[in-house]
Amino acid sequence: MRVNVRSNLAGKMRKKNFRKKFSRCQNRQTRFTKLKFMDLVIWRHAEAVDWQEDCDDLDRALTARGYKQAIRMAEWLDRQLPEGTRIFSSPARRCEDTVRRLDRKYKLHKNLLPDSSADELLASMQWPTSKGTFLLVGHQPMIGQIIAQSLGLKDSACAVRKASVWWLRSRERDGQRQTVLVTVQSADML
């Protein structure tokens, strides 16, 4: 009986290479958490009922379409966000209804109200020098102002679709602070 030494040796090499690759994958999460950058994930609330003269703007709820948008985006975010992400929401009902679909702990932040200042909010988050990942759920035009200011856009604000996410990363490269646009995701495209 002939034993194929070459195929037996090749099988051992494949197992050894698999173990190496597997251990690298396991260590990837550990290395990711040790990186020195700040992620700012900005999520605009999903579609809400229209404002009317006699209603309080902060009490507007999501529409049926808005709930579907929030669920789709929350499922995507849950797969992407690292453990330990600090989540903040505007106290407005439509923002809370949006962030609740994520099913993670969050805090209400008064600087995320519709008439708040983007500068005050960024200062309270210590953007861009803090470390870790922050998820903010808020309103236009403030989140558009945050994005434009962080990316150094000429306009003072940019348009942001309802239920969409903009993921920004602040990092230091060659002694210079940079803001990188990691991704923009729309609930309608999921």
Model-derived regions, located:
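Domain-level recognition of soluble alpha/beta enzyme cores
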Residues: 154-180, 189
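Short amphipathic alpha-helix with an adjacent loop that forms part of the alpha/beta core around
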Residues: 120-128
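Acidic, Ala/Val/Gly-enriched low-complexity intrinsically disordered segments
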Residues: 3-5, 10
